[in-house]
Amino acid sequence: MVNLNETVLGTELAKWDKYLDNFRDTNYFKKLKLFLKEGSRSKKFNTSIFEVFKPFDMVDPSKLKVVILTDTKHIHGGLPYGKMYNSSFDHENQEIETIKDSIELQFKEGLNMDFDDSLESWANQGVLILNSSLTHSSEGKDLYYKVWRRFNAHIVKCLVKNYTGIHYVFMGGKSIYYRKHIKSASNYVYNVSKPEKQSVVNFSAFKEINKKILEQNGEEFMINWTDYQ
């Protein structure tokens, strides 16, 4: 079993090592490790420390197609959850439900569909989903997004530097902060300034992404948003 120290050092970030080697030596990253250790020991967080970096373990950066960065606190057992990949059918997740509604409208003409709430099928297709805060307070308060700002900015800047043709979806004011790091000429950007149900349901990005992938790479590279893989 991976222990706390290994997790904080980024065991689940192994696939992303080429982007993080020097970053791990910064004072910021050292402080981030202490923050995670102390938060875990004092039970400040509402999610397991072993799952903080889970999205990075699930997505191979060399296969990356889409980055969705959101700041809506995902609901897990009545408390805000830092990211989406470890959601399950028996936990309410308001944002996943809203995104699901949007995809049903775009691809299923509003009909209900079978939906993988864990979003593992998306991860396998190169869709990385991050929250502006990878940890949230066990009290349900939005306290930590500033702690994660430099980490998320580093990830985005490294992706922009190393890859072109990535589709970046920003959902919420805090997430749009990272838009300034994107070179729109070589990537694609989609914004939802207020990720409320109505605005996201009418959000056409998922269909637009597939349209551009079809034009650039062919049908076999399109994201299957609606079905299990």
What are these regions (language model features)?
Residues 11, 18-167, 174-177, 182-184, ...:
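A polyanion-binding, active-site-adjacent surface
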